[in-house]
Amino acid sequence: MSWRLPMVALLASLASSAALADSLRVEGAHVRAVPPVSTTTAAFMVLHNEGEADRSLVAASTPAARVAELHNHVDVDGVMQMRRVEAVPVPANASVSLAPGGYHLMLIDLAAPLHEGDEVTLSLTFDDGQTLELEAPVRRIETMNHDQMDHQPEDMSHSGH
């Protein structure tokens, strides 16, 4: 009879760990395509925490780069600057976007050039030690070209020139 209590505690612990593991989900992961001479790029995605506990992304790694760091853009005296951060908070029952201009994963000192269509293995580590492995396609990030800009007639006045 004395073995039942420790066994129940162990099973409850395992079930709790499994529930935490199932609470995190990654969506839309991709790596920015860069020119072949570039040694740095970034990975973007949406982190979903469907659990009841706050979580934090605390580290990342990839065989595609020597260094993978968590970064964010912050306003410093009116100038946006990219800064390394120790963690990306992922609140309970919420989602956090890793996107251009905000949190993102910097891949530094690329092992080889990345081409559009390549797949990059990413390993994401969270504050509880859980690691999520995923494949992220390399994609070209579209930028707005001149034809996509919203030009209003008053904006196009060249008077005084």
Residue ranges: model-predicted function:
Residues 1-7:
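Bacterial N-terminal signal peptides that target proteins for export
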